[in-house]
Amino acid sequence: LVRGYHAVILRYSVEPARYPLALLQLAKSVAFLRKNAAEFHIDTNKIVLQGFSAGGHLAASLGVFWKKDFIAQTLGVTSDMVKPNGMILSYPVITSGEFAHTGSFECLLGEDYNDLDKRKEQSLEFQVSKDTPTTFLWHTVTDDCVPVENSLLFFNALRKFEIPVEMHLYPVSYTHLTLPTILR
């Protein structure tokens, strides 16, 4: 923070809430930061989302869906107000296909989980476009919860659209890898 970084934690709705509530909450938060950037000394060209696991799906969802009319219309803002400038996706849930973390999609979609079109819409490797922001991905190859293929699929989709992307793959996964207690 001493170097000018700001960190904001969003406590978004989870089960029993369903799509698109958490997405709208995240979009509203980004719009709030943009609207109040001067007060909070935020560079509006550097609003970067970070999400882990299912939170990675949420962050990536705003990255691929920010231009969808329903978001701006629901929130009463322009699409540019909710656009992330970049994403850091940490072992993200991406695909509802072969390498899915099924529980995440069941929670996200609820009764709509069996609707294959809705599941495919939430399979974010199919939603990447030229408007998806720069992305940093990291994952562990041996992740036994969210398969590494989730990051690989998103990486390949970003490459198809020539979106700047960097990915780090680590060979071994540890429980609670992102917690500082692993260093003790």
Question: What are the residue ranges of the model-derived segments?
Answer:
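Short amphipathic alpha-helix adjacent to the substrate-entry channel of hydrolases
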Residues: 1-8
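Short beta-strand/loop motif that positions the catalytic acidic residue
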Residues: 137-139
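Conserved alpha/beta-hydrolase "acid-adjacent" motif
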Residues: 145-150
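Conserved small/polar residues in nucleotide/adenosyl-binding loops
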Residues: 175-181
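Catalytic nucleophile-loop/oxyanion-hole region of alpha/beta-hydrolase
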Residues: 8-44
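Primarily recognizes the serine-hydrolase "nucleophile elbow" in alpha/beta-hydrolase
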Residues: 35-100
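Catalytic histidine neighborhood in serine/cysteine hydrolases
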Residues: 159-174
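Mobile cap/lid helix-loop segments that gate and shape the active-site cleft of serine hydrolases
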Residues: 92-127, 133
